[in-house]
Amino acid sequence: MSRYRGPRLRVTRRLGELPGLTRKASKKSNPPGQHGQARRKRSEYAIRLEEKQKLRFNYGVSERQLVRYVKKARAQEGSTGTNLLRLLENRLDNVCFRLGFGGTIPGSRQLVNHGHVTINGKVLDIAGYQCKPGDVISIKENKASKKLVEGNIEFPGLANVPPHIELDKPKLTGKINGKCDREWVALEINELLVVEYYSRKV
């Protein structure tokens, strides 16, 4: 399953607020469809599927990518759910979003893909790069790159930069100083349900 490129508000009407996907809020409260979804008790599978979809759409990863992240999270010590969230939070496109370089994760991904972002002084156009402690993320030293970011950083998608990331706003630079704490994940998600969803699939 490839990355979603359709209407974003349609997704948030179905799944709720996804801060990484869009800053806009739908004026319609009912789920998408001619008459919305019928009111009936959802199965446990449907609930787990919805949580998985929240994670996919918020961070903008494909099903195949998410499966890889789940496998990697399982192989690490500690809680698989927390490990999974940290892997997604450490993606370069998400770190740029948390720094305020892009208004959304898709916007930040575009900055990375188009070569406007450097890691430790070198241009890196891989949005899924896993940022690690000590990495310095900067906007490339040219007018075009800086102009793209300056408007976003004054009105970031999320108000607060997580404490594990250090932002030097005038220099348009950030530094990773540690791991992301669970409480600083902006998405309202039950990651344990995502792990359960994949328990028989991965």
Swiss-Prot record:
Keyword Transport (UniProt): no
Gene3D superfamilies in the record: Ribosomal Protein S4 Delta 41, Chain A, domain 1 (1.10.1050.10), RNA-binding S4 domain (3.10.290.10)
Segments for region (Disordered): 1-42
GO cellular component, one term: small ribosomal subunit
CDD domains referenced in this protein's UniProt entry, alphabetically: S4
Function: One of the primary rRNA binding proteins, it binds directly to 16S rRNA where it nucleates assembly of the body of the 30S subunit. With S5 and S12 plays an important role in translational accuracy.
Family statement: Belongs to the universal ribosomal protein uS4 family.
Protein's recorded name: Small ribosomal subunit protein uS4
Organism: Prochlorococcus marinus subsp. pastoris (strain CCMP1986 / NIES-2087 / MED4)
Gene (UniProt): rpsD
